[in-house]
Curated annotation (Swiss-Prot):
One of its GO terms (molecular function) is ethanol dehydrogenase (NAD+) activity. Pfam families: ADH_Fe_C, Aldedh, Fe-ADH. It catalyses: ethanol + NAD(+) = acetaldehyde + NADH + H(+); an aldehyde + NAD(+) + H2O = a carboxylate + NADH + 2 H(+). Contains an N-terminal aldehyde dehydrogenase (ALDH) domain and a C-terminal iron-dependent alcohol dehydrogenase (ADH) domain, interconnected by a short linker. GO terms for biological process: alcohol metabolic process; carbon utilization. It comes from the Bacteria. This is Aldehyde-alcohol dehydrogenase. Fe cation binds at residues 668, 672, 736, 750. Disulfide bonds: none annotated. Disruption phenotype: Reduction of 29.3%, in total NAD(H) pool, and 11.1% increase in the NAD+/NADH ratio. Significant, but modest, reduction in the ATP pool, and extends lag phase during growth. Increases susceptibility to gentamicin, but not erythromycin, chloramphenicol, rifampicin, penicillin and vancomycin. Reduces production of the bacterial capsule. Simultaneous disruption of alcohol dehydrogense adh resulted in similar growth rate, ATP level, and survival rate after erythromycin exposure. In the N-terminal section; belongs to the aldehyde dehydrogenase family.
Length: 883
């Protein structure tokens, strides 16, 4: 008789790979067929398949019990019921086909697609229920599944899969929607997991199998081992806790991975709990029996030299307590449900504190709450990271403390952990037989695995404009002598006036105090008159300290931009002392989504802004510019919480402003209005304000500077506030970005700096760019057209956008010259060499400035450096090139 041919490992591997490839190719065909199913068809298939499995739940449980020789028939039947009933009920109304969600407000549409062919790995512990579960969630998501069953449960697992498959096909599913490897082997399982046609791996099994799944270079939904503690704290319902733990631990002879592996009992209730535990046929082993149990279960004894090398004896998994005791070498009463072993600590020295997957449980005494939590934490971290932990207590706060302490995804409160872990019976966890352990357990999923995990959710995002706004002071008073409002303002008793020395010397401070003294109630006031031009953060801090000591209910900021800006930040520091200045100055793309959220102001004080120059518009804006002179930095701070409560725009306060000051501040107004009009955040609400402000400037600034008549001064005062209203909501651009940095370095006058830069910025922004700005509402470049609008309004040549840009830039330059401004930086007393040495740094700093993001074209550092260098000589001598 000829010798039987020996199959080599390589031949065995090739056979396995061929078989697997045939299965996967069939599954790929099924995938295309399943893509054609609609939601109604899918739900019908799942319903029919689940009913078929439900009808055979007892038959399948018996098959699994007989084939594996493990667990409890009745409990396996319950697990099959759970997979058919709870899982399907939970996903009954889940949309898994096509458009599953549509939101007209956000513009998002979600579309569900199958992930592809699923590789399903199942364990010997829950063979039929896991096969049912994975088949049903795959069908629900239109994914064909190919199983690699555990060899010791091959037939019962295939039996379960066959019932689901046949029912699904009868209901309209494609022929190969559910398949399995018929000749199980490690080679076949490896080939399936690594097959390029497999999209994802759904693995339930031992750590080695899960690790292998994650090593395949494709998405894997693998779950880790558990080592679940149950901490019974002294306030717990002892009868309930003992009942739950016994029921949970004995369920299917402890084979559910979420079952308790140790019970930790507070010393105050230890004896009472143990007595209750014993009443449910739990047998506590003695010292000798414990040693025998350790040796049989793990091959080592407690505190022996080789404890670290303990390995679970796979023969005990799912076996009855009586059988385990007998095999270990001792006898227990008939009907014993659980073997309990008292242990002194958690860890390698006590092998019975490891995961056992059998009706064997470690029992530990806790000396305190802290000790109980520590022991529970140690259990989870002893080869059970991320899985589950249970606590029995009446203390809700302790439950939260416990949840924070243990590295477990599932914290199960006052419930049996077997059913608490798999969900939907004792709590609202997702019903599942595959329990993710998150990053703690080196898993990609940190929840109970469900149908959602087998979907690719595509998002269709419709373009939408960001919601914009119009935020201004709640009240703005104007016209001559409108400071009389101070007599009538409500709830004014303690007033801090923030101003500068000029306001004191010119008598403006006295006029404010006079109005306060005319009130019916007596007003106590504190004066801080030390604000300097370009106020420094140290000045702000000094004013804040005085404010904290005085405790005002009203702040009045009197003066130009400097007192108003300083007062705003004092207001912020006074009401919110914990705020860090460094947080305030951070740049943002969208003021509503900034990394640092400004706190709301106005709880302690109201803020009244009274401008005495016509330039900054700070009385109506959410901005403040604060210097850090020690580091030559100037920071524009922006947040709507800084918007004054009330603005009083009284033209009588600007009649004595010197002409050169009116010139500088007037050009600042023009820059505000121009930059707001072309800003990418400009809107219909701000455009009208900006255009009116520009019109008022060109009609009145020259007369305001040269004649100082009431009419022109009033119009310029109004223009300043109107421009402020516009740029408070549309923001500014790079003229201000560069002006802030130049002013900080060379201490130039802010309005004059803007006047010199503005013609350059108009030409720069008016040139169609290569790199455009980013803002949804700004859907195409149009700054050149908006400059053309301005030129037309002013009656300038503007037959084309290019002509309008050039006309307007020239008009701005000529206006500056007419009012006496030397329109270059050379004539501001700045050394040419020093200017050029700093130009690069100033350009970088300007790019970082908060005004840059709203510029209508993306500002490039090289371009701003060129503008800065050209502006030294002035627009007339070196107008710069259009970039």
């Amino acid at each position: 008789m000829a010798d039987k041919k020996t199959v080599t490992p390589e031949e065995k591997k090739l056979v396995a790979e061929k078989h697997v490839d045939e299965l996967v190719q069939k599954a790929l065909v099924a995938l295309e067929e399943m893509r054609k199913l609609d939601q109604e068809q899918v739900d019908y298939i799942v319903a029919k398949a689940s009913v078929a499995a439900l009808d055979a739940h007892g038959e399948l449980a018996l098959h699994a019990f007989e084939e594996t020789g493990r667990g409890v028939f009745e409990d396996k039947a319950t697990k099959n019921l759970f997979a058919c009933e709870h899982v399907v009920n939970n996903m009954r109304h889940t949309k898994t086909v096509g458009v599953i969600e549509e939101d007209d407000v956000t513009g998002l549409t979600l579309i569900a697609e199958p992930v592809g062919v699923v590789c399903g790995i199942t364990p010997t512990t829950n063979p039929t229920s896991t096969a049912i579960f994975k088949s049903l969630i795959s069908l629900k998501t239109r994914n064909p599944i190919v199983f690699a069953f555990h060899p010791s449960a091959q037939e019962s697992s295939a039996h379960a899969a066959r019932i689901v498959r046949d029912a699904a096909i009868a209901a309209g599913a494609p022929e190969n929607c559910v398949q399995w490897i018929t000749q199980p082997s490690m080679e076949a399982t490896s080939a399936l997991m690594n097959h390029e046609g497999v999209a994802t791996i759904l693995a339930t099994g031992g750590n080695a199998m899960v690790k292998a799944a994650y090593s395949c270079g494709k998405p894997a939904l693998g779950v880790g081992a558990g080592n679940v503690p149950a901490y019974v704290e002294k306030s717990a319902n002892i009868r309930q806790a003992a009942h739950d733990i016994v029921m949970s631990k004995s369920f299917d002879n402890g084979m559910v991975c979420a079952s308790e592996q140790a019970v930790i009992i507070d010393k105050e209730i230890y004896d009472e709990f143990v007595a209750e535990f014993k009443s449910y046929h739990t047998y506590f082993v003695n010292k000798k029996e414990k040693a025998l149990l350790e040796e049989f279960c793990f091959g080592v004894k407690a505190n022996s030299k080789n404890c670290a090398g303990a390995k679970l004896n796979a023969d005990i998994v799912g076996k009855p307590a009586t059988w385990i005791a007998e095999q270990a070498g001792f006898t227990v009463p008939e009907g014993t449900n659980i073997l309990a072993a008292e242990c002194k600590e958690v860890g390698e020295n006590e092998p019975l504190t490891r995961e056992k997957l059998s009706p064997v449980i470690a029992v530990l005494k806790s000396e305190s709450r802290e000790d109980g939590i520590t022991k529970a934490r140690q259990m989870v971290e002893f080869n059970g990271l991320g899985h589950s932990a249970a606590i029995h207590t009446a203390d809700e706060e302790l439950t939260k403390e416990f949840g924070k302490a243990v590295k477990a995804i599932r914290v199960i409160c006052n419930s049996p952990s077997t059913f608490g872990g798999i969900g939907d019976v004792y709590n609202a966890f997702l019903p599942s037989l595959t329990l993710g352990c998150g990053s703690y357990g080196r898993n990609s999923v940190g929840d109970n695995v469900s149908a959602i995990n087998l979907l690719n959710i595509k998002k269709v995002g419709r373009r939408r404009n960001n919601m914009q706004w119009m935020k201004l002071p709640s009240k703005t008073y104007f016209e001559r002598d409108s400071i009389q409002y101070l007599q009538k303002c409500r709830d004014v008793e303690r007033v801090m006036i923030v101003t500068d020395h000029a306001m004191v010397e010119l008598g403006f401070l006295d006029r404010i105090i006079e109005q306060l003294d005319l009130r019916r109630n007596k007003v106590v006031y504190q004066i801080f008159a030390d604000v300097e031009p370009d106020p420094d953060i140290t000045t702000v801090n000094r004013g804040t300290e005085i404010m904290r000591a005085f405790k005002p209910d009203t702040i009045i900021a009197l003066g130009g931009g400097s007192p108003m800006d300083a007062a705003k930040v004092m207001w912020l520091f006074y009401e919110q002392p914990e705020v860090d200045f460094r947080d305030l100055v951070q740049k943002f793309m969208d003021i509503r989504k900034r990394a640092f959220k400004f706190p709301l102001l106005g709880k302690k004080t109201k803020f009244i802004a009274i401008p005495t120059t016509s330039g900054t518009g700070s009385e109506v804006t959410p901005f403040a510019v604060i210097s850090d002179k020690a580091n030559n930095r100037k920071y524009p701070i922006a947040d709507y919480s800084l918007t004054p409560t009330v603005a009083i725009v009284d033209p009588a306060l600007v009649l004595t402003v010197p002409g050169f000051v009116a010139a500088d501040t007037g050009m600042d107004v023009l820059t505000h209005a121009t930059e707001a009009y072309v800003s990418q955040m400009a809107s219909d609400y701000t455009d009208g304000l900006a255009l009116q402000a520009i019109k008022l400037v060109f009609e009145n600034l020259e007369s305001s500077v040269k004649n100082a008549d009431f009419h022109s001064r009033e119009k310029m005062h109004n223009a300043s506030t109107i421009a402020g209203m516009a740029f408070a909501n549309a923001f500014l651009g790079i003229s201000h970005s560069m002006a802030h940095k130049i002013g900080a370095q060379f201490h130039t006058i802010h309005g004059r700096t803007n006047a010199i830069l503005l013609p350059y910025v108009i030409r720069y922004n008016g040139t169609r760019p290569a790199k455009t700005a980013t803002w949804p509402k700004y859907n195409y470049y149009r700054a050149d057209e908006k400059y053309q609008d301005i030129a037309r309004m002013l009656g300038l040549p503007a037959s084309t956008p290019e002509e309008g840009v050039e006309s307007y830039a020239k008009a701005v330059y000529e206006l500056g010259e007419r009012i006496g401004i030397q329109m270059n930086f050379r004539d501001q007393g700045i050394d040419e060499k020093e200017w050029k040495e700093h130009s690069r740094k100033l350009a970088f700093l300007a790019y970082e400035d908060q005004c840059s993001p709203a510029n209508p074209r993306l500002p490039m550092v090289d371009h701003m450096q060129e503008i800065i260098e050209d502006a030294y000589y002035g627009y007339k001598e070196r107008p710069g090139r259009r970039k």
